[in-house]
């Protein structure tokens, strides 16, 4: 599954069988601290339960860590993912 970061739409996206799934984010900087706020995850209904949301989340977390962002999981899926995998 290919996931790309769409800077214009502030999302990590994948296209499967012509259906787009995405993890939305916002970037903020407060007091010199860079933050990435993961705000919403959407997976096309026919692709749910197949690891798409996890793959999008993993891509977003990897990007955040590689670029020195503090992670703020506003999206319930991302928050639950981090609770299940505290090392991620």
Language model features by range: what are they?
Residues 49-62:
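Conserved acetyl-CoA-binding loop-helix of GNAT-fold acetyltransferases
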Residues 1-11:
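Active-site rim helix/loop that mediates acceptor-substrate recognition in acyltransferases
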Residues 12, 17-34:
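A conserved beta-strand-loop-helix scaffold within acyl/acetyltransferase catalytic domains
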Residues 41-48:
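A short, internal acetyl-CoA/4′-phosphopantetheine-binding micro-motif in the GNAT/acyltransferase core
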Residues 22, 65, 73-88:
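Conserved active-site alpha-helix within GNAT-family acetyltransferase domains
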